Amino acid sequence: MFNLLKQVSDYAKESIEAAKYIGQGLSVTFDHMRRRPVTVQYPYEKLIPSERFRGRIHFEFDKCIACEVCVRVCPINLPVVDWEFNKAVKKKELKHYSIDFGVCIFCGNCVEYCPTNCLSMTEEYELATYDRHELNYDNVALGRLPYKVTEDPMVTPLRELGYLPKGVLDPHDLPSGNQRSGKRPEEIIAESD
């Protein structure tokens, strides 16, 4: 009889301990449910890169003096610099410059050590292609400036979307003269602050 009571009390203690552990796990889950989402719905929402973001390299052909410092400081000797010596002026003339972004590690050494600042990092990070040879950018492709994330044609239409007014479940129930269905996300955030 005493052994049976001991087993029942042990079972009760273990049940209480299990419930405590489940409660701890659920408290963490509920804590995370109250937080704002960290992720974005890419490509419709894009985070604006930080100021020191190292994206695709921008190259200015006219500033380059073909010194090849960028090749020497690159850990993988990546930039290809073709030049010709002009005997009349006694200077190097740049003929061709290219970088293969399929191999580039975006360390930024070439940008930092360039004496004429003809190289700079941009905020462009969407370089994915179906053919790896398209990642080999020549001086023409490196020279074009990328568009800003805030001016992206995929993101811009989303700014015009609004929420339905409170209590309206179907957008067809709105009055015909109403141009926008509700408040924009920026307006809702401004009201809450």
Swiss-Prot record:
Cross-referenced InterPro entries: 4Fe4S_Fe-S-bd (IPR017896), 4Fe4S_Fe_S_CS (IPR017900), NADH_quinone_OxRdtase_chainI (IPR010226), NDHI (IPR004497)
A biological-process GO annotation: photosynthesis, light reaction
Region: Disordered, residue numbers: 169-193
SUPFAM superfamilies per the UniProt record, alphabetical: 4Fe-4S ferredoxins (SSF54862)
One Pfam family of this chain: Fer4_7
Enzyme class, spelled out: translocase
Subunit composition and interactions: NDH-1 is composed of at least 11 different subunits.
Protein name, per record: NAD(P)H-quinone oxidoreductase subunit I
